[in-house]
Amino acid sequence: MASMIEVRDLLALQGRMEAKQLSLSLHTPQPLIDAMLERMEAMGRAQRIQEDADGCLTGSCKSCPEGKACLKEWWALR
């Protein structure tokens, strides 16, 4: 299990990462990583970065077969 400090350190080294990448790198369940990231966001230590749907060909995620899978959510330190 990873601590919040390890999550912070990995984000500092990598710049920005997805929660799934953090979970795999730290061998920690993703719900725990999600909770730590949300807590870090509430403390003002991390920020959520969402990609724009500019790469979407149709512009409509509802009709996209992948749903909103094309909209990635990244995390970075403030």
UniProtKB/Swiss-Prot annotation:
Alphabetical UniProt keywords: DNA-binding, Iron, Iron-sulfur, Metal-binding, Repressor, Transcription, Transcription regulation
Example of a GO MF term: DNA binding
Disulfide cysteine pairs (residue numbers): none
Keyword Lyase attributed: no
Source organism superkingdom: Bacteria
Transmembrane segments: none
Gene3D superfamilies: Winged helix-like DNA-binding domain superfamily/Winged helix DNA-binding domain
Binding site for iron-sulfur cluster: 56, 61, 64, 70
SUPFAM superfamilies: Winged helix' DNA-binding domain (SSF46785)
UniProt key word Nucleotide-binding: no
InterPro entries, alphabetized: FeoC (IPR023732), Tscrpt_reg_HTH_FeoC (IPR015102), WH-like_DNA-bd_sf (IPR036388), WH_DNA-bd_sf (IPR036390)
Residues of the signal peptide: none
Reported function: May function as a transcriptional regulator that controls feoABC expression.
Family affiliation: Belongs to the FeoC family.
Name of the protein described by the UniProt record: Probable [Fe-S]-dependent transcriptional repressor
Gene name per UniProt: feoC
